[in-house]
Amino acid sequence: MWAIIGIPVTVLLILYRCKPSIFSTMSEHTLDWVRDKAIGWSHTPPRNKIDTHHHCVPSFYAKAVEEQGGDPSGWPTPHWSPLASKLLMKRVGVETAVLSVTAPGACIMPSRSERAQLARKLNEYSAELRDKDPESFAFFVSLPSILDTEDALAEIAYGLDTLHADGVTLFTRYGSTNTYLGHADVEPIWAELDRRGCVVFIHPTHPVDTNPVNSKLPQPSIDYPHETTRTAMDMITNKTRLKYPRCKVILSHAGGALPYIISRVTTPMSKAPDFAVSHRMGITHDQAMESFRSFHFDLALSSSPQVLDMLLRMVPHDHILYGSDFPYAPITAYPAFLEALESYEMDPELREMINFGNAMKLFPRLSTPRGGSL
Protein backbone atom coordinates (compact mmCIF):
# COMPACT_ATOMS: atom_id res chain seq x y z
CA MET A 1 0.00 0.00 0.00
CA TRP A 2 2.94 2.32 0.64
CA ALA A 3 4.15 1.94 -2.92
CA ILE A 4 0.82 3.40 -4.01
CA ILE A 5 1.51 6.67 -2.26
CA GLY A 6 5.05 6.75 -3.61
CA ILE A 7 7.11 6.33 -0.44
CA PRO A 8 10.17 4.11 -1.04
CA VAL A 9 10.22 1.19 1.36
CA THR A 10 13.89 1.84 2.20
CA VAL A 11 12.90 5.27 3.50
CA LEU A 12 10.11 3.69 5.52
CA LEU A 13 12.54 1.25 7.06
CA ILE A 14 14.89 4.04 8.14
CA LEU A 15 11.96 5.92 9.63
CA TYR A 16 10.83 2.80 11.47
CA ARG A 17 14.25 2.28 13.04
CA CYS A 18 14.72 5.93 13.97
CA LYS A 19 11.15 7.04 14.75
CA PRO A 20 9.13 3.91 15.61
CA SER A 21 6.30 6.03 17.04
CA ILE A 22 5.40 7.01 13.46
CA PHE A 23 4.31 3.41 12.92
CA SER A 24 2.44 2.91 16.19
CA THR A 25 -0.86 2.36 14.40
CA MET A 26 0.58 0.10 11.70
CA SER A 27 -0.28 -3.58 11.94
CA GLU A 28 2.40 -6.19 12.59
CA HIS A 29 1.71 -7.69 9.17
CA THR A 30 2.44 -4.35 7.50
CA LEU A 31 5.62 -3.82 9.52
CA ASP A 32 6.85 -7.25 8.53
CA TRP A 33 6.01 -6.53 4.89
CA VAL A 34 7.92 -3.21 4.97
CA ARG A 35 11.00 -4.85 6.45
CA ASP A 36 10.92 -7.70 3.95
CA LYS A 37 10.57 -5.38 0.94
CA ALA A 38 13.35 -3.07 2.14
CA ILE A 39 16.03 -5.77 2.01
CA GLY A 40 18.09 -6.00 -1.16
CA TRP A 41 17.42 -9.61 -2.13
CA SER A 42 19.13 -10.68 -5.34
CA HIS A 43 17.26 -13.97 -5.70
CA THR A 44 15.32 -16.61 -3.80
CA PRO A 45 17.25 -19.87 -3.24
CA PRO A 46 15.69 -23.34 -2.95
CA ARG A 47 13.90 -23.87 0.38
CA ASN A 48 15.88 -26.72 1.89
CA LYS A 49 17.89 -25.20 4.76
CA ILE A 50 17.56 -25.94 8.46
CA ASP A 51 18.27 -22.73 10.35
CA THR A 52 19.80 -23.69 13.71
CA HIS A 53 20.27 -20.08 14.85
CA HIS A 54 16.89 -18.37 14.61
CA HIS A 55 15.35 -16.40 17.47
CA CYS A 56 11.79 -15.81 18.54
CA VAL A 57 10.88 -12.65 20.46
CA PRO A 58 7.31 -12.96 21.74
CA SER A 59 5.77 -9.68 22.84
CA PHE A 60 5.60 -10.68 26.52
CA TYR A 61 9.34 -11.38 26.47
CA ALA A 62 10.16 -8.07 24.77
CA LYS A 63 8.05 -6.31 27.41
CA ALA A 64 9.84 -8.12 30.25
CA VAL A 65 13.25 -7.11 28.89
CA GLU A 66 12.24 -3.47 28.52
CA GLU A 67 10.70 -3.39 32.02
CA GLN A 68 14.05 -4.53 33.42
CA GLY A 69 15.90 -1.71 31.69
CA GLY A 70 16.59 -3.36 28.35
CA ASP A 71 19.17 -5.86 27.18
CA PRO A 72 22.34 -5.33 29.29
CA SER A 73 24.39 -5.55 26.09
CA GLY A 74 22.73 -2.36 24.88
CA TRP A 75 21.33 -4.05 21.77
CA PRO A 76 17.72 -3.04 21.05
CA THR A 77 15.04 -5.71 21.25
CA PRO A 78 13.80 -6.16 17.66
CA HIS A 79 10.26 -6.34 16.36
CA TRP A 80 9.40 -9.97 15.65
CA SER A 81 6.41 -12.11 14.74
CA PRO A 82 5.97 -15.63 13.34
CA LEU A 83 5.12 -14.01 10.01
CA ALA A 84 8.41 -12.09 10.06
CA SER A 85 10.26 -15.38 10.56
CA LYS A 86 8.41 -17.03 7.69
CA LEU A 87 9.12 -14.14 5.33
CA LEU A 88 12.82 -14.33 6.15
CA MET A 89 12.82 -18.12 5.85
CA LYS A 90 11.33 -17.89 2.37
CA ARG A 91 13.92 -15.32 1.30
CA VAL A 92 16.99 -17.24 2.52
CA GLY A 93 15.70 -20.69 1.60
CA VAL A 94 14.93 -22.08 5.05
CA GLU A 95 12.40 -24.88 5.36
CA THR A 96 12.66 -25.30 9.15
CA ALA A 97 13.90 -22.86 11.79
CA VAL A 98 14.98 -24.13 15.20
CA LEU A 99 13.73 -21.33 17.44
CA SER A 100 15.63 -20.11 20.47
CA VAL A 101 15.40 -17.18 22.86
CA THR A 102 18.63 -15.25 22.88
CA ALA A 103 20.33 -13.57 25.82
CA PRO A 104 19.42 -12.26 28.31
CA GLY A 105 16.48 -14.68 28.20
CA ALA A 106 14.72 -15.52 31.45
CA CYS A 107 17.87 -14.46 33.33
CA ILE A 108 16.72 -10.85 32.91
CA MET A 109 14.26 -11.29 35.77
CA PRO A 110 15.44 -10.27 39.25
CA SER A 111 14.07 -13.16 41.32
CA ARG A 112 14.40 -16.91 41.10
CA SER A 113 10.65 -17.47 40.85
CA GLU A 114 10.27 -14.87 38.09
CA ARG A 115 13.09 -16.46 36.09
CA ALA A 116 11.44 -19.86 36.33
CA GLN A 117 8.04 -18.46 35.36
CA LEU A 118 9.37 -16.60 32.32
CA ALA A 119 11.33 -19.63 31.11
CA ARG A 120 8.20 -21.79 31.37
CA LYS A 121 6.12 -19.23 29.48
CA LEU A 122 8.73 -18.98 26.71
CA ASN A 123 8.87 -22.74 26.31
CA GLU A 124 5.12 -23.19 26.16
CA TYR A 125 4.90 -20.38 23.61
CA SER A 126 7.61 -22.00 21.46
CA ALA A 127 5.98 -25.42 21.71
CA GLU A 128 2.66 -23.95 20.60
CA LEU A 129 4.32 -22.40 17.53
CA ARG A 130 5.96 -25.73 16.72
CA ASP A 131 2.71 -27.64 17.17
CA LYS A 132 0.85 -25.28 14.83
CA ASP A 133 3.47 -25.65 12.09
CA PRO A 134 5.91 -28.51 12.79
CA GLU A 135 7.40 -28.36 9.29
CA SER A 136 8.43 -24.73 9.76
CA PHE A 137 9.46 -24.65 13.42
CA ALA A 138 11.39 -26.64 16.00
CA PHE A 139 12.73 -25.15 19.24
CA PHE A 140 15.38 -25.20 21.94
CA VAL A 141 14.34 -25.13 25.60
CA SER A 142 14.86 -21.81 27.38
CA LEU A 143 16.13 -22.12 30.95
CA PRO A 144 16.13 -19.94 34.04
CA SER A 145 19.63 -19.23 35.33
CA ILE A 146 21.44 -22.56 35.45
CA LEU A 147 22.88 -21.42 38.78
CA ASP A 148 19.32 -21.99 40.03
CA THR A 149 20.17 -25.65 39.58
CA GLU A 150 16.92 -27.27 40.69
CA ASP A 151 14.82 -24.89 38.58
CA ALA A 152 17.01 -25.43 35.52
CA LEU A 153 16.88 -29.22 35.86
CA ALA A 154 13.10 -29.09 36.27
CA GLU A 155 12.74 -26.99 33.10
CA ILE A 156 15.03 -29.33 31.15
CA ALA A 157 12.77 -32.22 32.11
CA TYR A 158 9.58 -30.32 31.29
CA GLY A 159 10.89 -28.96 28.01
CA LEU A 160 12.23 -32.27 26.73
CA ASP A 161 9.79 -34.78 28.22
CA THR A 162 6.50 -32.86 28.14
CA LEU A 163 7.00 -30.33 25.34
CA HIS A 164 9.32 -32.56 23.28
CA ALA A 165 11.76 -29.78 22.40
CA ASP A 166 14.66 -30.50 20.06
CA GLY A 167 17.43 -29.36 22.41
CA VAL A 168 18.39 -26.85 25.09
CA THR A 169 19.84 -23.33 24.97
CA LEU A 170 22.66 -22.35 27.32
CA PHE A 171 24.25 -18.92 27.50
CA THR A 172 28.01 -18.47 27.65
CA ARG A 173 28.07 -17.09 31.20
CA TYR A 174 25.80 -16.88 34.23
CA GLY A 175 25.56 -14.81 37.39
CA SER A 176 27.29 -11.60 38.37
CA THR A 177 30.74 -13.15 38.00
CA ASN A 178 32.46 -15.16 35.30
CA THR A 179 30.69 -18.49 35.76
CA TYR A 180 31.42 -19.91 32.33
CA LEU A 181 30.22 -23.31 31.18
CA GLY A 182 33.26 -25.27 32.36
CA HIS A 183 32.70 -24.18 35.97
CA ALA A 184 32.08 -26.81 38.63
CA ASP A 185 28.72 -25.22 39.48
CA VAL A 186 27.46 -26.14 36.01
CA GLU A 187 28.36 -29.83 36.28
CA PRO A 188 24.88 -31.00 37.40
CA ILE A 189 23.40 -29.40 34.28
CA TRP A 190 25.94 -31.04 31.97
CA ALA A 191 25.47 -34.39 33.68
CA GLU A 192 21.72 -34.33 33.00
CA LEU A 193 22.12 -33.12 29.43
CA ASP A 194 24.74 -35.80 28.79
CA ARG A 195 22.47 -38.49 30.26
CA ARG A 196 19.88 -37.47 27.69
CA GLY A 197 22.31 -37.16 24.78
CA CYS A 198 20.98 -33.64 24.29
CA VAL A 199 21.69 -31.10 21.55
CA VAL A 200 22.94 -27.98 23.34
CA PHE A 201 22.89 -24.61 21.59
CA ILE A 202 25.35 -22.18 23.21
CA HIS A 203 24.57 -18.53 22.61
CA PRO A 204 26.72 -15.64 23.83
CA THR A 205 25.56 -13.14 26.39
CA HIS A 206 27.11 -9.89 27.60
CA PRO A 207 30.37 -9.96 29.56
CA VAL A 208 30.52 -8.69 33.12
CA ASP A 209 31.91 -5.39 31.80
CA THR A 210 29.18 -4.02 29.55
CA ASN A 211 31.11 -0.91 28.46
CA PRO A 212 31.48 -0.88 24.65
CA VAL A 213 34.82 -0.18 23.00
CA ASN A 214 33.28 2.97 21.55
CA SER A 215 29.90 4.26 20.45
CA LYS A 216 30.37 2.92 16.91
CA LEU A 217 30.76 -0.70 18.02
CA PRO A 218 27.71 -2.30 19.62
CA GLN A 219 28.83 -4.76 22.25
CA PRO A 220 27.46 -7.90 20.54
CA SER A 221 29.40 -7.19 17.34
CA ILE A 222 32.80 -7.96 18.89
CA ASP A 223 32.26 -8.99 22.52
CA TYR A 224 29.79 -11.80 21.79
CA PRO A 225 32.29 -13.80 19.69
CA HIS A 226 34.88 -13.42 22.44
CA GLU A 227 32.42 -14.59 25.09
CA THR A 228 31.81 -17.72 23.02
CA THR A 229 35.57 -18.23 22.83
CA ARG A 230 35.97 -17.81 26.59
CA THR A 231 33.28 -20.32 27.49
CA ALA A 232 34.51 -22.85 24.90
CA MET A 233 38.07 -22.63 26.22
CA ASP A 234 36.73 -22.96 29.77
CA MET A 235 34.97 -26.16 28.70
CA ILE A 236 38.08 -27.45 26.92
CA THR A 237 40.56 -26.82 29.74
CA ASN A 238 38.18 -28.16 32.40
CA LYS A 239 37.54 -31.30 30.30
CA THR A 240 33.80 -30.62 30.11
CA ARG A 241 33.60 -31.96 26.56
CA LEU A 242 35.54 -35.10 27.52
CA LYS A 243 33.43 -35.75 30.61
CA TYR A 244 30.11 -35.23 28.82
CA PRO A 245 30.69 -36.49 25.27
CA ARG A 246 27.08 -37.46 24.55
CA CYS A 247 26.06 -33.79 24.40
CA LYS A 248 26.08 -32.42 20.87
CA VAL A 249 27.21 -28.84 21.47
CA ILE A 250 26.63 -26.07 18.91
CA LEU A 251 28.73 -22.90 19.17
CA SER A 252 27.19 -19.75 17.72
CA HIS A 253 28.80 -17.57 15.06
CA ALA A 254 31.33 -20.17 13.85
CA GLY A 255 32.68 -20.52 17.37
CA GLY A 256 33.50 -16.84 17.78
CA ALA A 257 37.28 -16.46 17.74
CA LEU A 258 37.87 -20.09 18.79
CA PRO A 259 39.06 -21.48 15.42
CA TYR A 260 41.60 -18.64 15.24
CA ILE A 261 42.66 -18.80 18.91
CA ILE A 262 42.85 -22.56 19.52
CA SER A 263 46.27 -23.00 17.89
CA ARG A 264 47.68 -20.14 20.00
CA VAL A 265 46.96 -22.31 23.03
CA THR A 266 47.64 -25.78 21.65
CA THR A 267 50.74 -25.29 19.46
CA PRO A 268 53.12 -24.77 22.43
CA MET A 269 51.46 -27.75 24.15
CA SER A 270 52.47 -30.01 21.26
CA LYS A 271 56.17 -29.58 22.09
CA ALA A 272 55.91 -30.33 25.82
CA PRO A 273 55.52 -33.69 27.58
CA ASP A 274 51.90 -34.61 28.24
CA PHE A 275 52.43 -34.84 32.00
CA ALA A 276 53.81 -31.29 32.12
CA VAL A 277 51.07 -29.86 29.91
CA SER A 278 48.36 -31.68 31.85
CA HIS A 279 49.75 -30.40 35.14
CA ARG A 280 49.76 -26.80 33.88
CA MET A 281 46.67 -26.75 31.64
CA GLY A 282 44.57 -29.60 33.01
CA ILE A 283 44.51 -31.25 29.58
CA THR A 284 46.93 -32.55 26.96
CA HIS A 285 47.38 -31.23 23.44
CA ASP A 286 45.50 -34.13 21.86
CA GLN A 287 42.66 -33.88 24.39
CA ALA A 288 42.33 -30.15 23.72
CA MET A 289 42.11 -30.67 19.97
CA GLU A 290 39.66 -33.55 20.40
CA SER A 291 37.46 -31.27 22.50
CA PHE A 292 37.73 -28.46 19.95
CA ARG A 293 36.71 -30.72 17.08
CA SER A 294 33.79 -32.11 19.06
CA PHE A 295 31.90 -28.82 18.81
CA HIS A 296 29.41 -28.04 16.07
CA PHE A 297 29.65 -24.56 14.53
CA ASP A 298 26.78 -22.53 13.08
CA LEU A 299 27.37 -19.96 10.36
CA ALA A 300 25.17 -17.17 11.73
CA LEU A 301 26.79 -13.88 10.61
CA SER A 302 29.87 -15.97 9.80
CA SER A 303 29.74 -17.15 6.18
CA SER A 304 32.28 -14.71 4.77
CA PRO A 305 35.01 -16.38 2.67
CA GLN A 306 37.73 -15.80 5.26
CA VAL A 307 35.73 -17.50 8.02
CA LEU A 308 34.69 -20.39 5.79
CA ASP A 309 38.31 -20.91 4.69
CA MET A 310 39.46 -21.34 8.29
CA LEU A 311 36.48 -23.34 9.48
CA LEU A 312 36.65 -25.83 6.61
CA ARG A 313 40.36 -26.39 7.28
CA MET A 314 40.00 -26.88 11.02
CA VAL A 315 36.73 -28.62 11.91
CA PRO A 316 34.92 -31.73 10.65
CA HIS A 317 32.76 -30.78 7.69
CA ASP A 318 29.81 -32.63 9.19
CA HIS A 319 29.92 -30.25 12.18
CA ILE A 320 29.08 -27.07 10.23
CA LEU A 321 25.48 -25.81 10.31
CA TYR A 322 23.49 -23.08 8.62
CA GLY A 323 22.26 -20.20 10.81
CA SER A 324 20.75 -16.76 10.15
CA ASP A 325 20.60 -14.98 13.56
CA PHE A 326 17.20 -13.55 12.66
CA PRO A 327 15.86 -11.06 13.81
CA TYR A 328 18.76 -9.57 15.80
CA ALA A 329 21.22 -8.87 12.98
CA PRO A 330 21.26 -5.62 11.00
CA ILE A 331 18.66 -5.93 8.26
CA THR A 332 21.24 -5.94 5.45
CA ALA A 333 23.15 -8.83 7.04
CA TYR A 334 20.74 -11.49 5.79
CA PRO A 335 21.16 -10.99 2.03
CA ALA A 336 24.86 -10.18 2.46
CA PHE A 337 25.76 -13.37 4.32
CA LEU A 338 23.45 -15.47 2.15
CA GLU A 339 25.22 -14.23 -0.98
CA ALA A 340 28.62 -14.85 0.63
CA LEU A 341 27.68 -18.44 1.44
CA GLU A 342 26.15 -19.14 -1.95
CA SER A 343 29.06 -17.65 -3.89
CA TYR A 344 31.69 -19.58 -1.90
CA GLU A 345 33.08 -22.38 -4.02
CA MET A 346 32.30 -25.83 -2.63
CA ASP A 347 31.02 -29.09 -4.03
CA PRO A 348 27.25 -29.73 -4.01
CA GLU A 349 27.51 -32.50 -1.41
CA LEU A 350 29.26 -30.22 1.10
CA ARG A 351 26.77 -27.43 0.44
CA GLU A 352 23.88 -29.76 1.19
CA MET A 353 25.61 -30.98 4.35
CA ILE A 354 25.90 -27.41 5.61
CA ASN A 355 22.44 -26.32 4.49
CA PHE A 356 20.53 -29.23 5.97
CA GLY A 357 22.29 -32.61 6.04
CA ASN A 358 24.34 -32.05 9.18
CA ALA A 359 21.36 -30.62 11.05
CA MET A 360 19.20 -33.59 10.06
CA LYS A 361 21.64 -35.85 11.91
CA LEU A 362 21.32 -33.72 15.05
CA PHE A 363 17.53 -33.44 14.88
CA PRO A 364 15.99 -36.77 13.82
CA ARG A 365 12.49 -35.26 13.65
CA LEU A 366 13.65 -33.05 10.80
CA SER A 367 15.09 -35.92 8.76
CA THR A 368 12.63 -35.63 5.89
CA PRO A 369 13.32 -35.34 2.14
CA ARG A 370 14.35 -31.82 1.08
CA GLY A 371 15.30 -29.92 -2.01
CA GLY A 372 18.72 -31.53 -2.29
CA SER A 373 19.98 -35.02 -2.99
CA LEU A 374 20.90 -36.06 0.56
What kind of region is each of these model predictions?
Residues W2-N48, V57-T96, E124-D131, A154, ...:
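Mid-to-C-terminal alpha-helical segments outside catalytic/metal-binding sites
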Residues T44-P46, H55-W80, M109-P110, A116, ...:
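Active-site gating loops and adjacent loop-to-helix segments of metal-dependent hydrolytic enzymes
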Residues I50-H54, A97-L99, F139-V141, V168-L170, ...:
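Hydrophobic faces of well-ordered beta-strands that scaffold small-molecule active sites
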Residues V57-F60, G105-C107, I146-L147, S176, ...:
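Active-site environment of divalent metal-dependent phosphoester hydrolases
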Residues E95, V101-N238:
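Active-site gating/metal-coordination segments in enzymes
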Residues V199-I202, H226-T237, R241, A257-M281, ...:
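Conserved N-terminal glycine/acidic-rich loop preference
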Residues L217-T229, L242-K243, V249-H253, P259, ...:
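Active-site core of metal-dependent hydrolases
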Residues P225, R246, V277-I331:
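Active-site-adjacent C-terminal substructures of enzyme catalytic domains
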